């Protein structure tokens, strides 16, 4: 009797195993691995961009200006690059972390709070879905980001100084920042497009 029961269970288990679609299971495992791999690559790329943004803002053509920790730089170009190469939420994180770290490392920690708010806003105008970095939308996005960033920092400066006149004067002097960042973004973007960077990192 027990032998018959065991044989019955054995036949049932074998039938269940045969009925399972192993191909579907393997495809699901592959899909999950792809998702994990994509997420891992995206997180690593985000951290890398945060480091690049921090370095370029803090040390590459970094020009101190004024006596309250202000400075001009062209590191925003790499925020724009992050915005066209990474999904928007990740680009925003890279922009906030990298830029705020640059403020802290260069003795401008008083600007870090404003930076954490302003820099992520700049990435919202770009698209990372196009096969090319330089396209009509991203060119206009770089222009808008430069203008908006300048205005927002002027407002932040006015609040910090208690004088919008002083903030406006420093903003006019610092117009090299959005202009320089725009030019560098276009130059690097065109070079990357020629090398088909976006297709290679997908």
Which role does the model predict for each range below?
Residues 2-202:
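Loop-helix junctions at membrane interfaces
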């Amino acid at each position: 009797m027990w032998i018959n029961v065991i044989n019955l269970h054995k036949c049932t288990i074998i039938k269940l195993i045969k009925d399972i679609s192993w191909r579907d299971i393997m495809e699901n495992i592959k899909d999950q691995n792809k998702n994990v791999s994509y997420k891992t690559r995206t997180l690593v790329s985000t951290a890398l961009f945060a480091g690049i943004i921090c370095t370029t803002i803090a040390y590459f053509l970094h020009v101190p200006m004024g006596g309250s920790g202000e400075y001009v730089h062209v590191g925003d170009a790499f925020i724009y690059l992050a915005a066209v190469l990474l999904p928007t939420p990740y680009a925003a994180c890279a922009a906030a972390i990298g830029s705020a770290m640059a403020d802290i490392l260069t003795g401008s920690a008083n600007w870090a709070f404003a930076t954490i708010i302003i820099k992520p806003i700049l990435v919202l105008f770009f698209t990372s879905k196009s096969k090319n970095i330089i396209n009509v939308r991203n060119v206009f996005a770089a222009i808008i980001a430069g203008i908006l960033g300048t205005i927002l920092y002027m407002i932040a400066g006015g609040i910090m100084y208690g004088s919008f006149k002083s903030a406006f004067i420093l903003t006019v002097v610092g117009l090299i920042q959005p202009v320089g960042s725009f030019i560098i973004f276009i130059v690097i973007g065109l070079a990357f497009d020629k090398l088909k960077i976006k297709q290679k990192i997908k």
